[in-house]
Regions:
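Mobile "lid/hinge" segments at catalytic clefts and subdomain interfaces of large enzymes
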Residues: 140-259, 453-553
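Conserved helix-loop functional segments at active or binding sites
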Residues: 95-103, 138, 335, 360-363, ...
Length: 712
């Protein structure tokens, strides 16, 4: 049955339709916000997957170019693989809804969000977040929502919910906040050094609207929601797990209490063998095959129980650290020859090598998406996580969603601190290679980025560091919890959150929050902000600035040299010339690359600074605007009966009429001048069309013979 539900979000009408599209999906809705329209379809497999130990959820966000009246530029005119921006939105939709599925649910679930139209004012991402929650809520798929999400901006010292296009352009914050009626379930943000206090107020303001949307979706659920289907529960055999806990809890606790990751894994493997042996004793010699799930789950759950117990009850970490203690940190720069900047940042057994490369404007990345204007990125950060970083032997398959997400987080952390294009007219690419991983590699990439940029001579405004906090909550009483600083892999894996924050010592530039429980309270978020800020201050002052106290004064000798200048936009055509004749001649003569913007900004690139200066001089002569009375030097370029044409340089030419060549009467120009002569001239007139008239009379030299004739 076709139904339309209407509400208001941030002062604008939002509608959710269901019962018309995709009727065979488990749940289907169309969300309209202004003229932005997103269709969300959710489907679930009827049978569970027996051979996996995780919940198989897939979330896609599809940006269709027809939504903004564009035709794809590919050969076959089809949309290609999702852009990085679409991947990031898919991840942002996934993270708040995943913890709300039953923990023992193993049916494959696929969620597809399709942008049907985008009015460039109302966020399709917000529509997709709301559509996902609504479609799941009214479907028969087991899920503990509803949840909702809104975008948040900060313009003119005011928090704006779901900012429009104009507000987004001026905003010092670009954040997406998701939550349930009770708690916050996801934060994704980039910000211009925003304080903890303002960020927390923004989250609270977002939650007000989130609560309203959750109530709205719950109304839909109550009216038209399908009964949730029954599913095969995947949970460990209780008698088996009870025996495992009774016999091996102390041994597993000792196994995970280890500083070295490799040794810890070896210890856990030994205990795991004993867990398998208990299964064989209880279920027979085929237990490893027939009770594979029970064994794997028992190993996982016992580790989780022990790690959480150590932190909650002993107030120490599995590796012996205090609750707020950061692992040993080291930083080095200039490790790799010939590259433009390099840095190695290590935090315990997490190690990241970051390389900076400086390029020309032509190296900037064009992002052709559903925005009307093609975005051009002059700063890029890419993150690679090879299997050898965790001691595994797996082939590389290129960047996946996780790599794209971590790279984007480290990228947005540094963007507010970059110099303007006018101040530093380079394209900048950073690549972070994870060499060793024991948690928080994305935050190590942020620190490595700061070091590599400073080593490359990029004049960043302030150093930026990144740190993660984790959460361990008492499963019996959620009001009892501990927020821990600088989480390693097992604390992330068995804990309740990974709260990543990048920023300076005073403010926040990036946030990414993943949770595994039912959400975070304001108190937990506030504590996470405070602890990450203290850790960032320490990392910046005690590690980063000791490795490189200030940004290099000059770029690497291997980096291209750039001269930036600004010309009158009306003169651009003169620099380029007919069919590019003039600019190509400059390039051929000097070996430089030249970029010219429509507003007259010119960038000259060359490995040899002297050649760049030569090209600059030529361009300056081309765009030079002469004034009447100005004295110049030029070369006679051609001769006519009525005068001589003088090349003033830079494709500028003036005429010396025969009457202005000499104070004496001359019959032929050739009697006085020849092509190639260097002459001094004065600008006598410039007409409305820019034609220049010259005079040489003022500079005529009187010869000795003329002096004698004059004296006689």
């Amino acid at each position: 049955m076709f139904k339309i539900y209407e509400t208001e979000l941030a002062g604008r009408k939002l509608t959710i339709e269901t019962g018309k599209f995709a009727m065979q999906a488990n749940g289907s809705v169309v969300v309209r916000y202004g003229e932005t329209t997103v269709m969300t379809n959710v489907t679930a497999a009827k049978e569970a997957q027996d051979d996996i130990d995780f919940f198989p959820l897939s979330v896609d966000y599809e940006e269709k170019l027809y939504s903004v009246g564009k035709i794809p530029g590919s050969y076959n005119r089809r949309e290609g693989k999702p852009a990085d921006s679409a991947v990031l939105i898919s991840r942002a939709i996934d993270r708040p809804i995943r913890p709300l599925f039953p923990s023992d649910f193993r049916n494959n679930v696929v969620i597809v969000n399709t942008v049907l139209s985008d009015d460039q004012e109302n966020s399709p991402e917000v529509c997709a977040q709301i559509g996902t929650s609504a479609a799941l809520a009214i479907s028969d798929i087991p899920w503990g929502g509803p949840s909702a999400a809104v975008a948040v901006g900060y313009v003119d010292d005011k928090i704006i919910i779901n900012p429009n296009c104009e507000q987004r352009a001026k905003s010092r914050m670009k954040a997406t906040v998701a939550g349930t009626k009770e708690k916050i379930t996801m934060i994704e943000a980039g910000a211009d050094n925003i304080s903890n206090e303002i960020m927390l107020e923004a989250i609270k303001a977002a939650h007000v609207e989130i609560k309203k949307m959750c109530e709205f979706i719950q109304t839909m659920r109550d009216e038209i929601g399908k009964p949730k289907f029954e599913y095969k529960s995947f949970s460990v055999n209780p008698e088996y797990f009870e025996r495992v806990c009774n016999e091996l809890t102390e041994e597993m606790t000792n196994a995970v209490k280890e500083t070295d990751k490799i040794t810890r894994n070896e210890n856990v493997d030994k205990v795991s063998e004993k867990i398998k042996n208990i299964a064989i004793e209880m279920f027979g010699e085929n237990a490893e095959e027939e009770h594979k799930f029970d064994i794997a789950t028992a190993i996982h759950d016992l580790q989780k129980k022990c790690v959480r117990s150590i932190i909650l009850n002993e107030h120490i970490r599995p590796d012996g650290r205090a609750i707020d203690e950061v692992r040993k940190l080291t930083a080095e720069v200039d490790l790799i020859p010939r590259v433009h900047g390099s840095a190695l940042f290590s935090r315990g057994q997490t190690q990241v090598l970051t390389i900076a490369t400086l390029g020309t404007k032509a190296d900037a990345q064009s992002l052709d998406g559903i925005d009307f204007d093609t975005e051009v990125k002059r700063y890029m950060h890419q993150y690679n996580f090879p299997s050898y970083s965790v001691g595994e032997a797996k082939p590389s398959r290129g960047a996946g969603r996780r790599e794209i997400g971590h790279g984007a987080l480290a990228e947005k952390a540094l963007v507010p601190m970059l110099p303007s294009e006018e101040e530093f007219p380079y394209t900048i690419r950073l690549v972070s290679e994870v060499l060793e991983s024991n948690g928080s590699t994305s935050q190590a990439s942020i620190c490595g980025s700061t070091l590599a940029l400073m080593a490359a001579g990029v004049p960043i405004k302030e150093p930026v560091a990144g740190i993660s906090t984790g959460l361990i909550t008492d499963l019996e009483d959620s009001s009892k919890y501990i927020v821990i600083t600088d989480i390693q892999d097992i604390e992330d894996f068995f804990g309740d959150m990974d709260f990543k924050v990048g920023g300076t010592g005073t403010g926040i530039t990036a946030i990414q929050v993943d949770i595994k429980n039912d959400g975070l309270t304001y108190e937990i978020i506030k504590e996470a902000f405070e602890k990450t800020q203290e850790a960032r201050k320490m990392i910046i002052n005690d590690v980063i600035l000791k490795a490189i106290p200030e940004t290099r004064k000059e770029v690497s000798k291997y980096a291209p040299k750039i001269i930036a200048m600004t010309i009158n936009p009306e003169k651009i055509k003169d620099v380029i010339g007919s069919g590019g004749k003039v600019i190509n001649k400059i390039i051929d003569e000097t070996g430089v690359k030249i970029d010219i913007d429509d507003d007259g900004k010119v960038a000259i690139y060359c490995d040899d600074i002297e050649n760049a200066k030569k090209a600059q001089k030529i361009i300056e002569s081309i765009v030079k605007e002469y004034e009447v009375g100005e004295i110049c030097e030029g070369t006679v370029s051609r001769i006519a009966k009525f005068g001589a044409f003088v090349d003033l340089g830079g494709n500028n030419e003036g005429l010396v009429h025969i009457s202005k060549i000499s104070n004496k009467r001359i019959e032929k120009v050739e009697d006085v001048l020849a092509v190639g002569d260097t002459v001094k001239v004065r600008i006598s007139e410039i007409d409305d069309q820019g034609k220049i008239s010259l005079s040489m009379k003022e500079f005529e030299t009187i010869t000795d013979t003329e002096k004698e004739e004059k004296e006689d």
